[in-house]
Amino acid sequence: MSKPFPLLKLPRLALDEILITMRPFELIQFSMTSSKSRIILKYLLRARVNSKYILLVNTFNEPKITFFGSDTYFDCQFTSNKLRSEKSEYFEAQNGLKYDRIWMYSDNVIMDWMRLFKIVMELFNFQRHAVILCLDTFPDQKKTIIDLMRSQLPSVNYCGFHGKIVADQDVEYFLKNINVTEYLDFKCKLSDNFQLKLTNNLEKISVTEGNWLNYSQLIQLKALDVEIKGSKITNVEMNAFLISWMMSKCHQDIVRLEIQVNDPETRDVILDLPHEIIDNDVIREGRTFKNEIIRMRGGIDIKRNDGATGTIYFKIDGDQLMLNMIVFCLYE
């Protein structure tokens, strides 16, 4: 039997040239051959200034680790289905993006997922991090999963909570230990007593099942973009919220609000405040507080005491009537 090629004994430049040609999964496998391999590979990969990726991990029944960069898309999914084990797909798109998808068999998918997660975090440079935590899966290991994430990711750009099982404690534990910096997405069931406690302002908060979100919590939400469905906020409370906004008492940084109207028959209660109905033929141009230029057609204007304009639209989304408000400054 021939001896394996002594790859690690190559000069630095030659080794780097070979590693550049290797796919992410090949690099991961190579790092697992020895501790020396991992140390050298970690040093070489992290020295590449341009090799920065976006990481997405999830904890569904078949947990996944995905990362992608300017020319690479890598996706590894763990499965307990032997028929799908060791399945792989690789192709190069016309735009030069290299797609590399792997299905790995495991008797304990979440433990092997956690092992790979640690290896990936050690080897590669990530400039953005996203986490989807499924509250229905691996309930006995949820704290261990979150603790691992905390050890590797003290902060994430995006966090999505998914699930039908009420798991307030898991959500609270995650948010207490891992800082979400941009986007918090609730696609999960929470109890009526759940209290969201945020210490920092976010780019966006989205709530799909807002049974827990009352007027007091709405006032305290800290985000530029707020989407809420399924809340119990009344039209009277919505009117009070808009009046508080007009008086600069809450949400001075908000750019967009979308919220369900619970009683469409009395939606006029919401607009029991100074407002102006803009003809639908009128198109206006303005700039949001995120410095985005927008064009608006029609709508219902309300004014804040500092001159900012909030334009309100009512629209049907499925079987729900939604109030949308976009905040901007009109061009003179």
Question: What positions do the PLM features span?
Answer:
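Non-core capping and flanking segments associated with repeat-based/extracellular domains
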Residues: 1-332
